[in-house]
C-alpha cells in the first residue's frame, strides 16, 4: 500500500495523547481516516501513513516522519518521530471516538543551533484521548511516560524525568512527575526534585482549587525550599470559567507550545479572569521546609489591574528557624554580604514577633502600590530596590 501524506494533530507532548478505548460500534477504516485527517489538519503535524489495519472495528494506523513545529521557544524547533502507532475506536456516545497513540523510544528535536537540538528517549510514552469529531475538541485525555530524557549532543546537557502524568478531565487538570534532574555542560548537576504535582479541580460551590506540591528539591544555592505545599481556592474564579482557559492551555501545550509558555498563558488568562471578577484568591495553606527552616501560613490575595505587581493581599506566616536564617542574611545593624543584596529580606526577618511554641510570627501585607509591610513596618517601598 503506497504511503499517504497527511497532517496529524497531536502536539509536542505526543506523549499525552495515546492508547485504548471502548469499542461500542465497528468503525470503518475510511471513516477513521477522515476523522484523523480533520483532527490532524487542525493541529498541523505532517506525517507519512505507513499502514492502516482494521481489527473488529479497531482501526490501527502507523506513521513515520511525524513532524511538528514547536512554538514558544527562543528559536524555531521541530519535533520528529518515526513509528508512531495510533488506534481509534468508536464509543457509545454519538460523535465521540477514543484515540490512542504509542510513541517510539527514540525521537529528535531539530533546530538550527546545535545547542537547541535534543536527542529524545521516551520509555512507555502513551495515553488516551476522547475526541468530539463534530465540534473538533477533546473531551478528555490522559498521558503518561515511565521515563523521558533529552540530551543536547555537543555539551551533553540533559534533563530527565520519571513517572510523567498529564491529565485533562471535565473535573480535573493534573501534571505530575517524579525523580526529575537537569544538568549543565558535561552533566554538571544543576538541580533535581523527587516529585512535583500541579492539580486544579472544582469545589462544592463551583470554586476553583489549585494545589501545588514538590518534595526533595535540590538546587546549587544557599536557600533550599526542599518541600513546598500550597493549597488555594477562589470563589471569584468559578470552575465553569476557569475550565475553558485550562482546556485551551493544555491543548496548546499538546500541540506544540512550549510548556513554560503554556503555563504563562494559563496563568495570565486566569489572572485576567480573577481581576475582572474582583473576588479574592484564598491561600488555604502554604508550607515551606528546607535546611532547618519551616514556615506555615495562610492568607488572601486579590488580582487587581491597578496593583503594581498584579495583586494585593495579606499572608500570616509562622516561622521556625529564624536564627538560622539570620545567620545567613544578618540583621539590619549587621547584614551579611548576602543580606546586603536583599535589605528588604533582612528588615522583614527582623520585624518578626514572638509566636506560639517557639515560632516567629509575620503578618505580611502586599499593598496596591507595591509596598511590603511586615508587622506594621514597611520593609520594601515598591520603588527601585528598597
Please state what every model-predicted region is:
Residues 24-386:
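Glycine-rich, small/hydroxylated-residue low-complexity segments
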Residues 15-24:
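C-terminal segment of classical bacterial N-terminal signal peptides
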Residues 9-11, 21, 313:
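Small side chains
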Residues 6-7, 18, 176:
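Small/flexible residues
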Residues 1-10:
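Bacterial N-terminal signal peptides that target proteins for export
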